Amino acid sequence: MGLAAPRKRTKISHDPNNTNWARSTSGFGHKILSSQGWTPGSFLGARDAAHADMFTAASAGHIRVVVKDDTLGLGARAGRDPNEPTGLDAFKGLLGRLNGKSDAELAADQRKADDIKLARYAAFKWQAVRFVSGGLLAQEKLERLPERESVQQSRAAVETSDSNRNSENDASKVSKKKKKKTSSDSSSDEQSSRSEKRREKKEKKDKKEKKEKKDKKDKKRKRAEEDNDASQKSASETPAPEKESTGLESDSTSVSVVKASRERRPLGRQIVRGRHIAQKKRALMDDKSLNEIFMVKA
Protein backbone atom coordinates (compact mmCIF):
# COMPACT_ATOMS: atom_id res chain seq x y z
CA MET A 1 0.00 0.00 0.00
CA GLY A 2 2.95 2.33 0.43
CA LEU A 3 3.48 5.04 3.03
CA ALA A 4 -0.18 6.10 2.98
CA ALA A 5 -1.38 2.75 4.30
CA PRO A 6 -2.17 2.34 7.99
CA ARG A 7 0.79 1.10 9.97
CA LYS A 8 0.41 -2.40 11.38
CA ARG A 9 2.79 -3.61 14.01
CA THR A 10 3.21 -7.38 14.14
CA LYS A 11 5.05 -9.14 16.91
CA ILE A 12 6.57 -12.55 16.29
CA SER A 13 5.55 -14.98 19.02
CA HIS A 14 7.88 -17.33 20.83
CA ASP A 15 6.32 -20.29 18.98
CA PRO A 16 5.87 -19.23 15.33
CA ASN A 17 5.48 -22.80 14.04
CA ASN A 18 3.00 -23.72 16.80
CA THR A 19 4.86 -26.85 17.85
CA ASN A 20 4.94 -26.40 21.63
CA TRP A 21 1.62 -28.20 22.08
CA ALA A 22 2.91 -31.25 20.19
CA ARG A 23 6.19 -31.42 22.09
CA SER A 24 4.77 -30.84 25.56
CA THR A 25 4.35 -33.93 27.73
CA SER A 26 2.21 -32.28 30.41
CA GLY A 27 -0.98 -31.95 28.35
CA PHE A 28 -4.12 -34.06 28.80
CA GLY A 29 -3.87 -35.68 25.37
CA HIS A 30 -0.30 -36.86 25.85
CA LYS A 31 -1.11 -38.25 29.30
CA ILE A 32 -4.19 -40.23 28.27
CA LEU A 33 -2.50 -41.67 25.16
CA SER A 34 0.56 -42.72 27.13
CA SER A 35 -1.71 -44.36 29.74
CA GLN A 36 -3.23 -46.49 26.96
CA GLY A 37 0.16 -47.70 25.71
CA TRP A 38 1.10 -45.05 23.16
CA THR A 39 4.67 -43.81 22.91
CA PRO A 40 5.98 -40.74 21.03
CA GLY A 41 6.75 -41.64 17.41
CA SER A 42 4.45 -44.70 17.25
CA PHE A 43 1.25 -45.06 15.24
CA LEU A 44 -2.28 -44.80 16.54
CA GLY A 45 -4.42 -47.92 16.68
CA ALA A 46 -3.76 -51.58 17.35
CA ARG A 47 -0.27 -52.82 16.57
CA ASP A 48 -1.44 -56.21 15.30
CA ALA A 49 -4.14 -54.77 13.00
CA ALA A 50 -4.73 -56.27 9.53
CA HIS A 51 -3.65 -53.04 7.81
CA ALA A 52 -0.56 -52.44 9.95
CA ASP A 53 1.69 -53.20 6.96
CA MET A 54 0.26 -50.22 5.10
CA PHE A 55 1.55 -47.66 7.61
CA THR A 56 4.28 -45.28 6.45
CA ALA A 57 6.34 -42.52 8.04
CA ALA A 58 3.59 -40.05 7.16
CA SER A 59 1.18 -41.93 9.42
CA ALA A 60 3.14 -40.72 12.45
CA GLY A 61 2.99 -37.06 11.37
CA HIS A 62 0.52 -34.43 12.43
CA ILE A 63 -2.87 -34.06 10.80
CA ARG A 64 -3.16 -30.79 8.90
CA VAL A 65 -6.41 -28.89 9.40
CA VAL A 66 -7.50 -26.22 6.91
CA VAL A 67 -10.17 -23.73 7.95
CA LYS A 68 -12.91 -23.26 5.34
CA ASP A 69 -13.26 -19.51 4.73
CA ASP A 70 -15.27 -19.48 1.46
CA THR A 71 -18.90 -20.11 0.50
CA LEU A 72 -18.21 -22.93 -1.95
CA GLY A 73 -19.80 -26.33 -1.46
CA LEU A 74 -18.10 -29.35 0.03
CA GLY A 75 -15.59 -30.83 -2.41
CA ALA A 76 -15.50 -27.71 -4.60
CA ARG A 77 -12.16 -26.22 -5.47
CA ALA A 78 -11.48 -22.57 -5.98
CA GLY A 79 -10.04 -21.34 -9.26
CA ARG A 80 -6.74 -20.47 -7.65
CA ASP A 81 -5.17 -21.42 -4.35
CA PRO A 82 -4.99 -18.27 -2.19
CA ASN A 83 -1.87 -19.56 -0.43
CA GLU A 84 -0.02 -20.23 -3.69
CA PRO A 85 3.00 -17.92 -4.13
CA THR A 86 3.21 -16.04 -7.42
CA GLY A 87 6.34 -16.20 -9.57
CA LEU A 88 7.82 -19.12 -7.65
CA ASP A 89 8.78 -21.04 -10.81
CA ALA A 90 10.85 -18.18 -12.20
CA PHE A 91 12.52 -17.67 -8.82
CA LYS A 92 13.41 -21.37 -8.63
CA GLY A 93 14.89 -21.19 -12.13
CA LEU A 94 17.02 -18.20 -11.15
CA LEU A 95 18.25 -19.99 -8.02
CA GLY A 96 19.02 -23.07 -10.12
CA ARG A 97 21.22 -21.07 -12.47
CA LEU A 98 23.02 -19.52 -9.51
CA ASN A 99 23.57 -22.99 -8.03
CA GLY A 100 25.11 -24.19 -11.28
CA LYS A 101 22.30 -26.25 -12.80
CA SER A 102 22.49 -26.92 -16.53
CA ASP A 103 19.98 -25.59 -19.03
CA ALA A 104 18.67 -29.12 -19.73
CA GLU A 105 17.80 -29.66 -16.06
CA LEU A 106 16.14 -26.24 -15.85
CA ALA A 107 14.11 -26.97 -19.01
CA ALA A 108 12.97 -30.31 -17.58
CA ASP A 109 11.87 -28.64 -14.33
CA GLN A 110 10.02 -25.95 -16.27
CA ARG A 111 8.28 -28.62 -18.37
CA LYS A 112 7.12 -30.42 -15.22
CA ALA A 113 5.74 -27.19 -13.78
CA ASP A 114 3.89 -26.44 -17.04
CA ASP A 115 2.39 -29.94 -17.08
CA ILE A 116 1.14 -29.50 -13.53
CA LYS A 117 -0.46 -26.15 -14.43
CA LEU A 118 -2.16 -27.68 -17.49
CA ALA A 119 -3.49 -30.58 -15.43
CA ARG A 120 -4.91 -28.17 -12.83
CA TYR A 121 -6.54 -26.03 -15.50
CA ALA A 122 -8.08 -29.06 -17.23
CA ALA A 123 -9.41 -30.42 -13.93
CA PHE A 124 -10.97 -27.04 -13.12
CA LYS A 125 -12.37 -26.41 -16.62
CA TRP A 126 -13.74 -29.89 -17.32
CA GLN A 127 -14.83 -31.50 -14.10
CA ALA A 128 -14.00 -35.18 -13.76
CA VAL A 129 -14.87 -37.86 -11.25
CA ARG A 130 -12.40 -38.02 -8.39
CA PHE A 131 -12.04 -41.17 -6.33
CA VAL A 132 -11.01 -40.58 -2.72
CA SER A 133 -9.45 -43.42 -0.79
CA GLY A 134 -11.58 -44.30 2.19
CA GLY A 135 -9.16 -46.69 3.87
CA LEU A 136 -8.90 -50.46 3.86
CA LEU A 137 -11.61 -52.87 4.91
CA ALA A 138 -9.67 -55.85 6.22
CA GLN A 139 -11.33 -58.71 8.06
CA GLU A 140 -9.50 -60.53 10.80
CA LYS A 141 -8.94 -64.27 10.46
CA LEU A 142 -11.43 -66.48 12.29
CA GLU A 143 -10.18 -69.75 13.76
CA ARG A 144 -12.81 -72.47 14.17
CA LEU A 145 -12.89 -74.25 17.50
CA PRO A 146 -12.78 -78.10 17.53
CA GLU A 147 -15.88 -78.31 19.78
CA ARG A 148 -17.98 -76.56 17.18
CA GLU A 149 -16.77 -78.96 14.49
CA SER A 150 -17.83 -82.00 16.55
CA VAL A 151 -21.23 -80.44 17.24
CA GLN A 152 -21.67 -79.75 13.53
CA GLN A 153 -20.79 -83.36 12.65
CA SER A 154 -23.37 -84.71 15.12
CA ARG A 155 -25.97 -82.33 13.71
CA ALA A 156 -25.17 -83.49 10.19
CA ALA A 157 -25.66 -87.15 11.20
CA VAL A 158 -29.03 -86.34 12.79
CA GLU A 159 -30.07 -84.41 9.70
CA THR A 160 -29.20 -87.34 7.38
CA SER A 161 -31.38 -89.73 9.44
CA ASP A 162 -34.22 -87.22 9.43
CA SER A 163 -33.87 -86.72 5.68
CA ASN A 164 -34.17 -90.49 5.09
CA ARG A 165 -37.38 -90.62 7.10
CA ASN A 166 -38.74 -87.57 5.32
CA SER A 167 -37.98 -89.11 1.92
CA GLU A 168 -40.07 -92.21 2.79
CA ASN A 169 -42.95 -90.03 3.98
CA ASP A 170 -42.68 -87.90 0.85
CA ALA A 171 -42.95 -90.96 -1.40
CA SER A 172 -46.18 -92.06 0.28
CA LYS A 173 -47.56 -88.52 0.06
CA VAL A 174 -46.72 -88.30 -3.64
CA SER A 175 -48.67 -91.48 -4.40
CA LYS A 176 -51.71 -90.13 -2.53
CA LYS A 177 -51.47 -86.80 -4.35
CA LYS A 178 -51.43 -88.56 -7.74
CA LYS A 179 -54.69 -90.30 -6.91
CA LYS A 180 -56.27 -87.04 -5.83
CA LYS A 181 -55.05 -85.30 -8.99
CA THR A 182 -56.76 -87.83 -11.28
CA SER A 183 -60.11 -87.24 -9.55
CA SER A 184 -59.64 -83.47 -9.44
CA ASP A 185 -58.68 -83.31 -13.15
CA SER A 186 -62.00 -84.81 -14.23
CA SER A 187 -63.97 -82.33 -12.08
CA SER A 188 -61.85 -79.40 -13.32
CA ASP A 189 -62.58 -80.36 -16.96
CA GLU A 190 -66.32 -80.24 -16.30
CA GLN A 191 -66.02 -76.85 -14.61
CA SER A 192 -63.92 -75.44 -17.45
CA SER A 193 -66.48 -76.58 -20.07
CA ARG A 194 -69.29 -74.92 -18.09
CA SER A 195 -67.35 -71.69 -17.72
CA GLU A 196 -66.62 -71.62 -21.48
CA LYS A 197 -70.32 -72.00 -22.30
CA ARG A 198 -71.22 -69.16 -19.92
CA ARG A 199 -68.55 -66.94 -21.45
CA GLU A 200 -69.80 -67.62 -25.00
CA LYS A 201 -73.38 -66.77 -24.00
CA LYS A 202 -72.22 -63.53 -22.39
CA GLU A 203 -70.22 -62.52 -25.49
CA LYS A 204 -73.22 -63.15 -27.77
CA LYS A 205 -75.45 -61.06 -25.52
CA ASP A 206 -72.94 -58.16 -25.47
CA LYS A 207 -72.63 -58.21 -29.28
CA LYS A 208 -76.41 -58.12 -29.67
CA GLU A 209 -76.74 -55.13 -27.31
CA LYS A 210 -73.97 -53.22 -29.12
CA LYS A 211 -75.65 -53.83 -32.49
CA GLU A 212 -79.02 -52.57 -31.20
CA LYS A 213 -77.41 -49.39 -29.81
CA LYS A 214 -75.66 -48.75 -33.12
CA ASP A 215 -78.91 -49.17 -35.09
CA LYS A 216 -80.70 -46.71 -32.79
CA LYS A 217 -77.95 -44.11 -33.27
CA ASP A 218 -78.10 -44.49 -37.07
CA LYS A 219 -81.88 -44.04 -37.09
CA LYS A 220 -81.64 -40.88 -34.97
CA ARG A 221 -78.96 -39.44 -37.23
CA LYS A 222 -81.02 -40.14 -40.38
CA ARG A 223 -84.10 -38.50 -38.86
CA ALA A 224 -82.11 -35.38 -37.96
CA GLU A 225 -80.70 -35.14 -41.49
CA GLU A 226 -84.19 -35.49 -43.02
CA ASP A 227 -85.54 -32.73 -40.75
CA ASN A 228 -82.69 -30.40 -41.76
CA ASP A 229 -83.29 -31.06 -45.47
CA ALA A 230 -87.02 -30.37 -45.12
CA SER A 231 -86.41 -27.07 -43.29
CA GLN A 232 -83.93 -25.94 -45.96
CA LYS A 233 -86.38 -26.76 -48.78
CA SER A 234 -89.21 -24.84 -47.11
CA ALA A 235 -86.97 -21.81 -46.62
CA SER A 236 -85.91 -21.84 -50.30
CA GLU A 237 -89.50 -22.22 -51.61
CA THR A 238 -90.93 -19.17 -49.74
CA PRO A 239 -90.88 -16.13 -52.13
CA ALA A 240 -89.16 -12.94 -50.99
CA PRO A 241 -91.52 -9.90 -50.67
CA GLU A 242 -91.09 -7.36 -53.42
CA LYS A 243 -92.34 -3.82 -53.50
CA GLU A 244 -93.19 -1.86 -56.62
CA SER A 245 -91.37 1.40 -56.88
CA THR A 246 -92.09 4.39 -59.11
CA GLY A 247 -89.49 7.01 -59.99
CA LEU A 248 -86.12 7.82 -58.52
CA GLU A 249 -87.52 8.73 -55.11
CA SER A 250 -89.17 5.33 -54.56
CA ASP A 251 -85.99 3.45 -55.65
CA SER A 252 -83.80 5.35 -53.23
CA THR A 253 -86.24 4.88 -50.36
CA SER A 254 -86.50 1.10 -50.99
CA VAL A 255 -82.72 0.71 -50.98
CA SER A 256 -82.42 2.64 -47.76
CA VAL A 257 -85.18 0.58 -46.12
CA VAL A 258 -83.49 -2.71 -47.08
CA LYS A 259 -80.13 -1.53 -45.74
CA ALA A 260 -81.67 -0.27 -42.52
CA SER A 261 -83.40 -3.59 -41.97
CA ARG A 262 -80.15 -5.50 -42.40
CA GLU A 263 -78.28 -3.26 -39.93
CA ARG A 264 -78.21 -4.17 -36.28
CA ARG A 265 -80.70 -2.14 -34.31
CA PRO A 266 -79.25 -0.70 -31.07
CA LEU A 267 -80.97 -1.18 -27.75
CA GLY A 268 -81.47 1.08 -24.74
CA ARG A 269 -80.20 4.67 -24.71
CA GLN A 270 -78.66 4.39 -28.20
CA ILE A 271 -82.04 4.14 -29.98
CA VAL A 272 -82.40 7.93 -30.40
CA ARG A 273 -78.88 8.30 -31.74
CA GLY A 274 -79.44 5.43 -34.17
CA ARG A 275 -82.61 7.03 -35.51
CA HIS A 276 -80.81 10.33 -36.07
CA ILE A 277 -78.00 8.61 -37.99
CA ALA A 278 -80.54 6.69 -40.11
CA GLN A 279 -82.32 9.93 -41.02
CA LYS A 280 -79.01 11.46 -42.12
CA LYS A 281 -78.27 8.48 -44.36
CA ARG A 282 -81.71 8.70 -45.99
CA ALA A 283 -81.31 12.43 -46.60
CA LEU A 284 -77.90 11.97 -48.24
CA MET A 285 -79.17 9.23 -50.54
CA ASP A 286 -82.19 11.30 -51.72
CA ASP A 287 -81.45 13.86 -54.47
CA LYS A 288 -84.40 16.08 -53.61
CA SER A 289 -83.46 16.41 -49.98
CA LEU A 290 -79.85 17.20 -50.93
CA ASN A 291 -81.07 20.03 -53.18
CA GLU A 292 -83.14 21.41 -50.31
CA ILE A 293 -80.16 21.25 -47.97
CA PHE A 294 -77.80 23.04 -50.36
CA MET A 295 -80.62 25.38 -51.54
CA VAL A 296 -80.21 24.39 -55.17
CA LYS A 297 -83.12 24.41 -57.62
CA ALA A 298 -83.36 21.23 -59.71
From Swiss-Prot:
PANTHER family according to UniProt: G PATCH DOMAIN CONTAINING PROTEIN, PROTEIN PXR1
Domain G-patch as annotated: residue spans: 25-79
GO biological process: rRNA processing
UniProt keyword ATP-binding present: no
Biased composition (Polar residues): 151-164, 247-256
Subcellular location, principal: nucleus
GO terms assigned for molecular function: nucleic acid binding
Subcellular localization(s) per the UniProt record: Nucleus, Nucleolus
Region described as Disordered: spans on this chain: 1-23, 145-274
Free-text function comment from the UniProt entry: Involved in rRNA-processing at A0, A1 and A2 sites and negatively regulates telomerase.
Keywords on record: Nucleus, Ribosome biogenesis, rRNA processing
UniProt record similarity statement: Belongs to the PINX1 family.
Name this protein carries in UniProt: Protein pxr1
Keyword rRNA processing (UniProt): yes
Residue stretches of biased makeup (Basic residues): 1-11, 199-222
Species lineage: Eukaryota, Fungi, Dikarya, Ascomycota, Pezizomycotina
InterPro entries the record matches: G_patch_dom, PINX1
Record-level GO cellular component terms: nucleolus
